[in-house]
Regions:
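Outer-membrane beta-barrel transmembrane domain signature
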Residues: 144-230
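Extracellular loop and loop/strand-boundary signature of outer-membrane beta-barrel proteins
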Residues: 48-56, 92-100, 142-149, 206-210, ...
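Residues on the lipid-exposed face of transmembrane beta-strands in outer-membrane beta-barrel proteins
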Residues: 62-72, 106-114, 128, 132, ...
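Short loop/turn motifs that connect adjacent beta-strands in outer-membrane beta-barrel proteins
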Residues: 25-34, 71-81, 115-124, 166-174, ...
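Outer-membrane beta-barrel "beta-signal"
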Residues: 254-285
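Short glycine/proline- and aromatic-enriched beta-strand/turn motifs that initiate or cap beta-hairpins
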Residues: 22-82, 92, 283-285
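Residues that define the transmembrane beta-barrel architecture of outer-membrane proteins
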Residues: 56-64, 79, 100-108, 122, ...
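Transmembrane beta-barrel strands of outer-membrane/channel proteins
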Residues: 36-46, 83-91, 126-136, 153, ...
Length: 285
C-alpha cells in the first residue's frame, strides 16, 4: 500500500511539473503580413446592350485596381481572405464610327478561402464571399433612354492558385484568380421602361434574382509578381465577361486588359512591442 501511495505521489508531482513548464512557455507569435497590390489596366472593350441599341460597340477599356490577401487570424495555415476593388472606364464606337457609348463602373468583393498545398511552392484556395458591381452605360444618341444602369449584389465563388518559382535567380509568384457569382440580385428594368417612370414610382420588378441562366460573370486574372526587392513588379492579364438577359433585354460586356503595377508584403508592427525571435510568419501566397 505504501508503495502504491509513493508511486501516485510521484506521478502527481511529475504532472504538476509538466503543467507548470507548459504554462511558463510563451506561445509562438504568429505574424500575418498583408500581400497588397496597386495596378493599372488597359485594353479592349466590347459592348452590346439592347436597352440602348441593338448594335455592337467596340473600343478601349482602362482601370485602376487594388487587391490584398492575408492569412486569417483564427486559422492562418488553412484560411485566407481576399479583398479586391476596381474602377473602370470604357469608351466604344459602333461599326460605322459615328456613335459613342461610355461605361463607368466600380466593383468590390471580399472572400474567405480554404487553402491547401498539394505541392511544394504551390497553394490552391477555394471559397465564397459577397460582391458588388455598380456602373452605368451612356449613349448620347438615345434621347429618351440615354443610360443603362448595371447594379448587382452577389454571392461569389472565388478561387486562386499561386505558384512560387525562380526564373534564374529571380523569385517569381504566378497567381491565377477566377471569380464567378453564384447567386444574388441585379437591377433589370422592363424593355423600353424610362428611368423617369422609375423616378415617378414604377418600382415593380426592378430587382431580379440572379443565377447563371440570366446573370453570368467570369472575372479572372493571371499575374506574375517579380520580386526584385521589398517591392515587386506585377505584370499580367485581366479579363471579364458579363452576360445578362432579363425583360427581353440582353447585355454583353467583354473586357481584355494588360495589367502592370506594384505589389509587396506589409506588416504592421507596434513600436511598443518587439517582435519575438521565435515569431512565425504565415504568408497569404
Amino acid at each position: 500500500m505504501n508503495g502504491l501511495r509513493h508511486r501516485m505521489a510521484a506521478v502527481a508531482a511529475a504532472l504538476s511539473v509538466a503543467m507548470m513548464s507548459a504554462a511558463s512557455e510563451p506561445e509562438t507569435e504568429i505574424l500575418r503580413p498583408v500581400t497588397a497590390a496597386y495596378t493599372v489596366e488597359a485594353g479592349s472593350s466590347h459592348i452590346a446592350d439592347t436597352y440602348l441599341s441593338p448594335i455592337r460597340y467596340a473600343g478601349w477599356s482602362a482601370g485602376f485596381g487594388y487587391g490584398r490577401m492575408q492569412a486569417m487570424k483564427f486559422s492562418p495555415e488553412r484560411w485566407v481572405m481576399a479583398l479586391d476593388a476596381r474602377l473602370t472606364a470604357e469608351r466604344a464606337l459602333n461599326r460605322v464610327g459615328n456613335a459613342t457609348m461610355w461605361y463607368w463602373g466600380v466593383e468590390a468583393r471580399w472572400a474567405m478561402m480554404r487553402r491547401v498545398r498539394p505541392l511544394a511552392g504551390l497553394t490552391v484556395g477555394l471559397g465564397v464571399g459577397p460582391g458588388l458591381k455598380a456602373g452605368c452605360l451612356y449613349s448620347q444618341r438615345n434621347g429618351n433612354n440615354p443610360a443603362s444602369a448595371k447594379v448587382a449584389l452577389t454571392v461569389d465563388l472565388s478561387a486562386y492558385a499561386a505558384w512560387n518559382i525562380r526564373v534564374g535567380r529571380l523569385p517569381v509568384t504566378l497567381c491565377y484568380r477566377p471569380v464567378v457569382p453564384l447567386t444574388g440580385v441585379f437591377f433589370a428594368p422592363d424593355y423600353g421602361e424610362l428611368y423617369y417612370e422609375i423616378y415617378l414610382g414604377n418600382h415593380s420588378g426592378l430587382a431580379r434574382m440572379a443565377w447563371w441562366g440570366n446573370y453570368f460573370v467570369l472575372d479572372h486574372s493571371l499575374t506574375a509578381d517579380l520580386h526584385f526587392g521589398n517591392t515587386s513588379l506585377r505584370i499580367g492579364y485581366s479579363g471579364q465577361v458579363l452576360s445578362t438577359k432579363a425583360s427581353d433585354i440582353t447585355s454583353r460586356m467583354i473586357r481584355h486588359c494588360a495589367v502592370i503595377g506594384v505589389s509587396g508584403e506589409w506588416l504592421s508592427v507596434s513600436p511598443r512591442k518587439k517582435i519575438s525571435p521565435k515569431a512565425r510568419m504565415i504568408h497569404a501566397l
